[in-house]
């Protein structure tokens, strides 16, 4: 059986966004106390088209380029290219779409939404395993080898009714659903392709849904908490 997880109070920290000039710029140094720019090595092997996602683990950067080179590339923190992870193509061990990735326990997990598969690699890019998913999703996170969190939308999962109307669900290593989170009331949401709704930082998984002023945390036990509320001075997202 699976559980429906209620949201409880967490830090409840309010972030005051301040006044933004829609005709001006939002400068990073006004929002962050530290900003570091890294020039990535530019060789034929290391070129990246668009940076869609970056994860930093153990003095290395892992850069996702979903549409140009369709790959995850590994660099040092100084920007030196190390290796590519994953292989785009039509073969049985290749990705047809590099939708998302995460890093867990010295493994890189690449999600292929098109095939509903997870490709598991070593940090050096050696393929270890391919797992078939019974549902479709557009983001993933792995707390441990037996604890996954997935993010998806209804449009792709009418064949899997137990997760319909939920944005998030938690499974074991066999992808049996244990918890369902972030309920979406029927007729009161839109099926849109959201990007980077899940993000991990300092061993905590965060969830931010589109057009919301609230950032939630999700624990390995499936507890979901309000953590941060963005004060937009009476305006609504995405105003």
Q: At which residue positions do the language-model features occur?
A:
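Eukaryotic scaffold repeat domains enriched in small/polar residues
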Residues: 1-239
């Amino acid at each position: 059986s699976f559980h429906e997880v209620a949201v409880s109070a967490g830090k409840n920290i309010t972030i005051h966004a301040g006044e933004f000039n829609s005709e001006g710029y939002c400068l990073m140094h006004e929002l962050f106390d530290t900003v570091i720019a890294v020039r990535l090595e530019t060789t034929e092997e290391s070129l990246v088209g668009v940076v869609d996602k970056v994860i930093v683990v153990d003095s290395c950067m892992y850069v996702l380029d979903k549409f140009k080179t369709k790959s995850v590339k590994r660099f040092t923190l100084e920007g030196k290219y190390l290796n590519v992870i994953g292989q785009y193509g039509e073969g049985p061990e290749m990705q047809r779409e590099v939708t998302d990735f995460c890093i867990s326990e010295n493994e890189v997990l690449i999600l292929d939404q098109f095939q509903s598969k997870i490709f598991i690699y070593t940090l050096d890019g050696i393929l270890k395993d391919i797992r078939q998913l019974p549902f479709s999703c557009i983001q993933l996170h792995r707390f441990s080898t037996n604890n996954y969190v997935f993010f998806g939308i209804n449009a792709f999962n009418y064949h899997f009714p137990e997760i319909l109307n939920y944005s998030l669900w938690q499974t074991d290593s066999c992808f049996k659903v244990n918890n369902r989170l972030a309920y979406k009331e029927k007729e009161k949401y839109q099926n849109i392709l959201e990007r980077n709704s899940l993000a991990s930082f300092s061993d905590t998984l965060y969830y931010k849904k589109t057009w919301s002023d609230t950032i939630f945390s999700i624990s390995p036990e499936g507890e979901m908490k309000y953590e941060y509320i963005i004060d937009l001075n009476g305006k609504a997202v995405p105003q």
